[in-house]
Amino acid sequence: MKQTVYTASPESQQIHVWSLNHEGTLTLVQVVDVPGQVQPMVVSPDKRYLYVGVRPEFRVLAYRIAPDDGALTFAAESALPGSPTHISTDHHGRFVFVGSYNAGNVSVTRLQDGLPVELVDVVEGLDGCHSANITPDNRTLWVPALKQDRICLFTLSDDGHLVAQEPAEVNTVEGAGPRHMVFHPNRQYAYCVNELNSSVDVWQLKNPHGEIECVQTLDMMPADFSDTRWAADIHITPDGRHLYACDRTASLITVFSVSEDGSVLSVEGFQPTEVQPRGFNIDNSGKYLIAAGQKSHHIAVYEITGTQGLLTEKGRYAVGQGPMWVVVNAY
């Protein structure tokens, strides 16, 4: 299995393309100059394209991924209705979802042969919209509205329109600020990192009464932390055993173990990392974690070790200015 790591640096308008080997070493393959401040990125389900959101001219760009080394070639672009904060796709590669924090909306762009071709739908009124997350069954889009302490729930129609479900939302505690999400591989639970109080919520997608329920909320900060809380990103290993979340003020990654059924998180430790970690990701083998320091202008590679999933640094690498996003592609 070959793996490629992509890092987005908006201040220098660059994407760095890295080859990741089995020992956790990165080798630079390419530096792409992007026509705009590149921020969120996602790889298409068929692993042939990288979709990126740029500003100040709000667009989604599609890059073809070379099958031999992961290098990028520009392929197409499509306009967006707001500054892109988060980008994702449905599992069949038919639609791109973009959440916009500043515009307070989520948009759906149709893909044709892997390329963005037209805007299909826009839902407004999502104050502080910070991500769009499709459920494993490809039916429901979870959209956190950070400033409203709610996660809105939409059914994805066959033609790409978003239809509010009943109930249309679930709510966090006041002042939590739901931000990014991941789903457990067993499809029974979702985990949401809350930016403003640096906590993680565990959501059961269907409890015994057929309802969505928050079954656990866990503080992700050390007991003696007293500064401003500013959580950012969250990811889970492919086997569902370990979950990680980062805080930018403390410049740390919190390590969680996940119970076998996915319902309970336990804090296992805290890993100091690059300054102001805005984004990170986990490789497809579940062996390595790559974190980006927005203020250090470096990325760090960690090996995920032992039954607790603690992190051991393998190396750090200079990237562009203000790196914010990391994605990994395996082929």
UniProtKB/Swiss-Prot annotation:
Gene name of the record: pgl
Q: Does the keyword Heme apply?
A: no
Membrane-crossing ranges are none
Kindly give the InterPro entries that the UniProt entry links to this protein.
6-phosphogluconolactonase_YbhE (IPR022528), Cycloisomerase_2 (IPR050282), Lactonase_7-beta_prop (IPR019405), N2O_reductase_N (IPR011045), WD40/YVTN_repeat-like_dom_sf (IPR015943)
Q: Which UniProt keywords apply?
A: Carbohydrate metabolism, Glucose metabolism, Hydrolase
Q: Which reaction does it catalyse?
A: 6-phospho-D-glucono-1,5-lactone + H2O = 6-phospho-D-gluconate + H(+)
- Protein name (Swiss-Prot/TrEMBL): 6-phosphogluconolactonase
Pathway the protein takes part in: Carbohydrate degradation; pentose phosphate pathway; D-ribulose 5-phosphate from D-glucose 6-phosphate (oxidative stage): step 2/3
Q: What does the UniProt function comment say about this protein?
A: Catalyzes the hydrolysis of 6-phosphogluconolactone to 6-phosphogluconate.
A Pfam family recorded for this sequence: Lactonase
Q: Which domain of life is it from?
A: Bacteria
Q: Which SUPFAM superfamilies match?
A: Nitrous oxide reductase, N-terminal domain
- For this UniProt entry, what's an example GO CC term? cytosol
- UniProt-listed GO biological process terms: glucose metabolic process; pentose-phosphate shunt, oxidative branch
Q: Which organism is it from?
A: Salmonella heidelberg (strain SL476)
The UniProt record lists the EC number as: 3.1.1.31
Q: Which GO terms describe its molecular function?
A: 6-phosphogluconolactonase activity
The family line of this record is: Belongs to the cycloisomerase 2 family.
